[in-house]
Regions:
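N-terminal glycine-/serine-/threonine-rich beta1-alpha1-beta2 phosphate-ribose binding loop
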Residues: 1-135, 147, 151-159, 450
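C-terminal helical cap and adjacent loop that interface with cofactors, partners, or active-site loops
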Residues: 15, 49, 248, 318-451
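A structural signal for well-ordered alpha-helical segments within the folded catalytic domains
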Residues: 48, 120, 124, 144-147, ...
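Short beta->alpha connector loops at strand-helix junctions that form conserved
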Residues: 136-138, 164
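Active-site beta-strand termini and strand-to-loop segments that position acidic
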Residues: 299-305, 329
Length: 451
């Protein structure tokens, strides 16, 4: 709860002027005259954070913004003006005005930060328009949408990147470095997920984004206006990529390995109902609703190379934040909860090491190079790195670290978990979104210091 509130406080700087640390500007790989022209589709709280970080770069220009909420556009314009940036073209004339933004010749790339149901169609439209697309998580809601992303990328040759920031968390990248250097031995098992009390996010009073009230949908504001309906209507892991994205990078999913099958189970749904009764009373209309999403959803994924991944979705109950990472191989393991590592032959037998000394030893080159300047970018610095990877990839018009095949495979967990739960935990096969090419695709080089 505190991490989200701290993020909101930083994002709201946009409404009161931009606090820019002196001397911090980013952008290096292309000539300064070759600025990447970016259109922002969605400048709510998440999109505004991306905008705040883009303003700090000297290699990009914001040429257009689009949001159906005129107030969000005004805040974005104010931030750009106070930073001495040119005024972009504004699009706010209905839900499909973003397509007019995509028609602009002075837009090379777009960043999509909108409600989930718009992610695939906007990303698809962007690729069809020849715009390099960055989309927030998750990228798709159905298997058909997953294929839409892959097919559109292949048919147009235009790239897209799923903007999964946790792949760039400092401890996650250090552990990735350990995996690639074979510290854990041959990898066998992983645990991850999204465990975060979002009751105060999914329900509010229609005036305050977080922390008050029992409304959602038409009577809600911010995320409660759209996110909570997924909990009402879908019994699925609707937000898997924060956990699965980093694990996929560690075991080269879609690049020599792939997800093969998934089984999922859900508990009963009580958390949101009890929260509504607590803050809105037993007679509140929303207290009469039956939410479909189980409070805790647990999925087990098998890979073609023989690893298993347990993924947990737990957002409707009182609990501290945790992504629940566990990374295990034949020589040892790391567990984030407890901040502990055990490496056979290095650790004392049957005793955990504190993780800090290992994470410092294997600190990732990216964090060694950019860590100090990335700290204020949002979410502990992760947002700087994921945005930097997007910008640098788009400037060169090359495949990003997390591409259309990754977006499809990771996002497919949602509909496949839903099907498995509906069928009493029956295993569901993952489509091969690479059409067999995962066998010969080379692993992405994550151990470098540029992006």
């Amino acid at each position: 709860m505190s991490s989200r509130r701290n993020f909101i406080k930083k994002s709201l700087i946009l409404g009161a002027g931009m606090a820019v640390a002196p001397g911090i500007t980013f952008g290096s790989s292309n000539k300064k005259s070759q600025k990447l022209k970016i259109g922002m589709i969605g400048v709510g709280l998440r999109g505004s954070n991306h905008l705040r970080n883009l303003i700090l770069r000297n290699d990009v220009e914001i040429t257009a913004i689009c949001d159906i909420d005129p107030n969000r556009n005004k805040l974005a314009l104010k931030a750009l003006d106070e930073a001495g940036r040119k005024k972009p073209k504004v699009y706010s004339n209905g839900e499909y005005d973003y397509r007019n933004l995509l028609d602009r010749k002075d837009v090379d790339a777009v960043i999509i930060s909108t409600p989930w149901l718009w992610h695939t169609r906007m990303t698809k439209d962007a690729m069809l328009a020849g715009k390099y697309a960055g989309v927030e998580v998750s990228a798709a809601n159905t298997i058909e949408e997953c294929w839409d992303l892959v097919n559109t990328h292949e048919n147009t040759g235009t790239h897209m990147m799923i903007l999964e920031n946790v792949n760039y968390r400092r401890d996650v990248l250090a552990v990735l470095n350990m995996v690639k250097q074979n510290v854990f031995g041959e990898m066998t098992h992983f645990r991850c997920g999204y465990q975060h009390d979002l009751r105060f996010v999914k329900l509010n009073d229609g005036k305050t984004a977080y922390g008050k009230g029992a409304e959602f949908g038409a009577k809600g504001i911010s995320e409660s206006a759209w996110r909570t309906n997924h909990s009402l209507l879908r019994n699925a892991d609707v937000y898997p990529t924060h956990g699965v994205g980093p694990i996929a990078a560690m075991i080269d999913i879609n690049r020599g390995n792939r997800f093969s099958s998934i089984t999922s189970h859900a508990t009963k749904a009580v958390g949101l109902h009890k929260y509504i009764e607590k803050v809105g009373g037993h007679d509140h209309p929303n207290a009469k609703l039956k939410f479909k999403q189980g409070d805790v959803i647990t999925s087990t994924i098998e890979t073609t190379n023989g690893e298993t991944i347990i993924v947990t979705h737990d957002v409707n109950s009182p609990r501290p934040y945790s992504l629940g990472f566990r990374v295990q191989g034949s020589n040892g393991l790391w567990e984030k909860d407890g901040d502990r590592i055990y490496i056979e032959g290095e650790s004392k037998p049957h005793q955990w090491d504190e993780s800090n000394k290992w994470l410092e030893k294997y600190d990732h080159p990216l964090w060694q190079k950019y860590g100090e300047m990335a700290t204020g970018a949002g979410h502990g610095g992760m947002d700087f790195f994921v945005l930097n990877a997007f910008v640098e990839s788009a400037k060169q018009n090359i495949a990003p670290p997390m591409d259309a095949y990754d977006a499809a495979a990771w996002s497919a967990i949602t509909p496949l978990s839903e099907l498995s739960i509906e069928n009493n935990g029956e295993p569901q096969d993952f489509p091969d979104f690479t059409r067999g090419n995962w066998v010969k695709r080379k692993p992405y080089n994550w151990i470098k210091n540029d992006y």
